[in-house]
């Protein structure tokens, strides 16, 4: 393949959040960056709709962040299809590990509802 490619996956979230508690998406983001330290959270605002602390870059070269109320995961730029599959699978694994570690796999469901490619 003579092209650099990557995927951006949006995850819809179904949850039983109660009023006054942090959102499930926020708790998962915090688990990724603060508890597990899988990457570095952004310390500066990236855009008008992406404030500081909204997400960050992962040590695998990808990016996880909250966009308009849903979690997104972007693979790093890749040169092969097998790398795209590996990094895309890594995003799903990170989410599954978060839910298992926080014992929320029965309370929260993430659904891959949109994939953009570039």
Where are these regions (language model features)?
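Histidine-centered divalent-metal-coordination microenvironment in nucleic-acid enzymes
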Residues: 114-118
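Terminal catalytic/cofactor-binding subdomain
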Residues: 1-112
